[in-house]
């Protein structure tokens, strides 16, 4: 089949063809960038937190309405830890001050030298009297976990800064690379909390592969975390994080809450939550955006397909006599079908070419304004393929109806 007759027909009635091509171009530009954003957001939401088997982890926040003095609070924390360890199905318990991905907790500035004017980084400040490495399943890539003699018992109301100097610190690999770039090992190095003369030194005794901050930021600072061995009184409540046996999470959570409620010496407020729910809450907006963009993309495909079907149906109606003449002159059904498919392919190709340029332009705008990653060429190739296939499928119905028109019906005068 020659392309020239098809092109001549399109040039004589180019308004419809231009509208379809424009619709394809705009849809391709939006679709490719929307799916690129979806891929980015889903990759962010799927980032590992550093916590092994999150589906088995939960925590209980405890708030005693009558706290008691420092010694009473220390005794209560130890007793509650023992109570939770005794719950059937609890494999590990650790006291802590905050949890990853909760968007609530403490952050400290850290430096490699107290003489620094500016901090090296801002890092999440986790503290524990037990082993977060064991309870959370953190991967220790260098050094060791804390010893019992390194744990400080601090009174938040009375102890001064000198009393709260950590005896050790465990940091993440990302933070180690930030504070001491290129260092072969950071074990034994001193990490300073703060800068200047008041900075608190702590020897690095361990490095974990990954531990997200409480904010779980998208940038690399989302893994800038520190853990220090400490137990604190007169804080903002107490948090116990636990690992349950596989498949026992719901039961263990209920029994752990009941055990704390039963052994409490006074009024107490308990709040239990799973790490899996924290992940859902943290990335709820990302997932909602992804579904919204997917919905928009599907609607665009449906609208584009409807436009192609409508335009092709109109052309079939307008060309009934022309089709009948061609059939009378010996054109086969497959020739008529091929004519409309080729015509649609030409229109779609123009739209795809324009859509690729629009996609690149839109992506450059997003890169400059929102610091997004550049659009991979795979999205352009995939998008082009989708619209070529969509065009062929959408036009097939009207084209088949055109191919079934009989010469006598098409040429019959009104």
List PLM regions with ranges.
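Short beta-strand boundary microenvironments
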Residues: 86, 90-187, 199-214, 234
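Alpha-helical transmembrane segments
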Residues: 26-55, 367-371
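C-terminal membrane-exit region of the final transmembrane helix in multipass inner-membrane proteins
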Residues: 2-6, 383-414
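"Rare, low-scoring activations can occur
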Residues: 81-87, 167, 173-174, 198-290
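Membrane-helix entry/capping segments
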Residues: 1, 8, 12, 16, ...
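Hydrophobic alpha-helical transmembrane segments of multi-pass inner-membrane transport and secretion
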Residues: 12-40, 286-321, 349-354
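Transmembrane alpha-helical interface segments in multi-pass membrane proteins
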Residues: 300, 313, 321-367, 381-382, ...
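Intracellular coupling helices
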Residues: 4-11, 15, 306-347, 404-413
